[in-house]
Amino acid sequence: MSTGVQTKAAPGAGQHADGPRLLADIGGTNARFALETSPGEIGSVKVYPCADYPGVAEVIKRYLKDTKIGRVNHAAIAIANPVDGDQVSMTNHDWSFSIEATRRALGFDTLLVVNDFTALAMALPGLTDAQRVQVGGGTRRPNSVIGLLGPGTGMGVSGLIPADDRWIALGSEGGHATFAPADEREDIVLQYARKKWSHVSFERVAAGPGIEVIYRALAGRDKKRVAANVDTIEIVKRAMEGEPLAAESVDVFCGILGTFAGNIAVTLGALGGIYIGGGVVPRLGELFARSSFRKRFEAKGRFEAYLQNVPTYVITAEYPAFLGVSAILAEQLSNRAGGSSSAVFERIRQMRDALTPAERRVADLALNHPRSIINDPIVDIARKADVSQPTVIRFCRSLGCQGLSDFKLKLATGLTGTIPVSHSQVHLGDTATDFGAKVLDNTVSAILQLREHLNFEHVERAIDLLNGARRIEFYGLGNSNIVAQDAHYKFFRFGIPTIAYGDLYMQAASAALLGKGDVIVAVSKSGRAPELLRVLDVAMQAGAKVIAITSSNTPLAKRATVALETDHIEIRESQLSMISRILHLVMIDILAVGVAIRRAVPSADVAETVAKARQGADDDATAVLDWLSHGAASSARD
């Protein structure tokens, strides 16, 4: 069905090539859903009571069943809750869920979950005049910062900053800023509120429940008794009926909100306007229009003229969060592979019509089921696309990729947005599916972040030092000794004198014998062990070089000749190294492959190299590269 959020699609915009997108706005009471079939075309809106369903996945399944939609590849949820990492536990309802586990359970390629106020903020640039009402004067300045307030059960605060051709939404807890009264009536309100709370924030008096606080404070001033069952809804009803105390309370509420909105405007420089959402103000109607809101908004002394030019709007769109979450999802999908026209998803769409019918089936599989392409062997990919294996390879090369492996890497890069970038905590009661997925996702996320932030110039320097070393010693204490032993096992195949020490006394004794041309690779999660640092100082003073595999800005990283920084979430020394150990092992693999490439014979002698490798010539670096599982010798045999 058509809804109030439906907007005119861009000229020439067709349906989403990857199918309809599921949009959701989930609050503490209701879960609202819609389908976006093409940019700006949002329909099939349905509302479900949260209390009727045990969790998010169940209510989404019900919506998909009710709308009789075949498959959804991409979905986005705006939720009335902070979103930090993979695990979401609603504060105003008893739902708790893992984003990634829910995505897998529903079979989505993408499931994006954002704070509902962030989604509302992203909707603002697309609102039409029919979806907002201006209160007071002022003229909106294009391409300027926009502010947003949302008095509801709490007080949401956000802002939008223009950045080239897009907007950046600010996360904020501005509603918890300290309330400061501006007149005698507000002094009375503050005195009353202080008896209830040690810290009185604007949220206490300018959100929905604040109307009741104000009403009871002013009733105390007038020595009037207020029944216990009088709440905000009843007070607003009385104000509309003309009861003096209720009308005064609503006006004080609007004045406080005006002060707060003015604070946000001058703080953000919101020349693009201040928007008011939430469930309270739109229901006040003429009470708000006639209130002291705008007068108090402008009452900033020397900045009164500044604020007179800033417009204020009340959002009247029925489902504005759908517009915002749609914009966030669209940007997320666009940014999967850099957002440029050469991005792998966009390139597939652009080239699809020029492909052969068989290659087109592979393209459709990649667009609709990208994880299947990434995870499956070529025989399964060919079977699912109903093509031959050579057709899969031809498709990859038609996109400019060297082969299937190269295409999988580029496709995986485009999908990293669905992998949590924050550490997901394992909780008591998690099923094996949940905690297993969290451990794997945390590890994958850490490796992807390492790939993005690793200084490859430092990697090159470290490889050069190792390749030219007279002797290499690997030092690691405790859990890091596992990494040192693994490195020793790999590097001794290069014919360089190599050893690993996990005992501090052996490290000290050996380091005293090192000198120019020798290299120590020190592996440490904390990078702060004073005994290890003293040992390395002795070796470096004698001319040895030190490669550190550790966290950034640690004493070890600062001392080392070359630091390979592997930052991770395990920041407390009391935590067992799990993710950090994996990252350290990955760094050793990178260094070993790099040295193998440096020491490999010229490509013209590959045939001879393969022959030597078959004869067990382990000292040949090309054979070692193959032994490390990253080389080409094995493929040359096949």
UniProtKB/Swiss-Prot annotation:
Protein name as catalogued: Bifunctional protein glk
Keyword check for Iron: no
CDD domains (UniProt xref): ASKHA_NBD_GLK, SIS_RpiR
Domain of life: Bacteria
Organism ancestry: Bacteria, Pseudomonadati, Pseudomonadota, Betaproteobacteria, Burkholderiales
GO MF term set: ATP binding; D-glucose binding; DNA binding; DNA-binding transcription factor activity; glucokinase activity
Documented EC number(s): 2.7.1.2
Record feature DNA-binding region, as residue ranges: 378-397
Region feature (Glucokinase): 1-341
Organism: Paraburkholderia xenovorans (strain LB400)
